[in-house]
Amino acid sequence: MTHVRDMDEADIEAVSRIRVRGWQAAYAGLVPGTHLDAMTVEDDAARRRQWFSRPGRTSRDLVAVADGRGPVGWLCYGPPPAGAPDPAGSGEVYALYVAPDLIGTGVGRRLLEEAHHRMRAEGFTASALWVLAGNERALRFYERSGYEADGRTQDDVYDEVTLTELRYRRPL
């Protein structure tokens, strides 16, 4: 049985492990291997501790917890980044990762449904997120969850390779 709750500081190591392993599994063949190989749980956890304890942080973190296993998924959401040209009332899912051995078991869906529920309760009327072009599994997942590409793109550079992200949106 898996349930979703707010992330707390004790979850940081598990969330970093989920995020790093998630990147390495989901982005193999898309993001340069040198970048993926350089990722470590320890470095991610150190950055996450700083970020998690930042005063005035407006993002929210959720974890999916499996009985007897601890956190097996993580989602972070909140308002669009400062300066983003989003309509009033829009929120953004910044990240969603599931332990690679549990992808396709409903953990990600439960996290996303809970995030949508909380976003509506916080007054958001729409949700946006960014998906790496070519990440077909993620694109199918978000499309099944009611998201549609809105035509916006942004580029990120990983080890001198430019990759494009596509923005997806859905009403809440």
Which positions does each model-derived feature cover?
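C-terminal "cap" of GNAT-fold acetyltransferases
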Residues: 90-91, 125-140, 144-172
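Conserved G/P- and acidic residue-centered "switch" motifs that form tight phosphate/ATP-binding loops
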Residues: 106
